Amino acid sequence: MSDTLNRVAQVLEDRKGADADSSYVASLYHKGLNKILEKLGEESVETIIAAKDAQISGDCSDVIYETADLWFHSLVMLAQLGQHPQAVLDELDRRFGLSGHAEKASRPSA
């Protein structure tokens, strides 16, 4: 796993015990999963808008910035749920070399 992801994961774990007034991440943890999911939704919308703007302007700087926010808040969500980013990387690795259609067909139906 990337050193950056490891460092972020460690900081997110460390913030679980921090005072909510001293850390943005600690304040999210303190407010609970619903607040984290709300932020994740906001960042998703901002990323989509930035991508549409980038397609028109050719400037991807905002989409990179917003994607970083989206990934970050996804990592906060995973940490809140007791999951490490490595679990997502393992899932991506499992899918590597598997066609998207085959992967989708292998999922249990809802």
Curated annotation (Swiss-Prot):
Gene3D superfamilies: MazG-like. Pathway: Amino-acid biosynthesis; L-histidine biosynthesis; L-histidine from 5-phospho-alpha-D-ribose 1-diphosphate: step 2/9. SUPFAM superfamilies: all-alpha NTP pyrophosphatases. GO terms for molecular function: ATP binding; phosphoribosyl-ATP diphosphatase activity. It is found in: Cytoplasm. GO terms for biological process: L-histidine biosynthetic process. Its main location: cytoplasm. InterPro entries: HisE, PRib-ATP_PPHydrolase-like. Keywords: Amino-acid biosynthesis, ATP-binding, Cytoplasm, Histidine biosynthesis, Hydrolase, Nucleotide-binding. Pfam families: PRA-PH (PF01503). CDD domains: NTP-PPase_HisIE_like. NCBIfam families: histidine_hisI (TIGR03188), PRK00400.1-3 (NF001611). Belongs to the PRA-PH family. This is Phosphoribosyl-ATP pyrophosphatase. It comes from Pseudomonas fluorescens (strain SBW25).
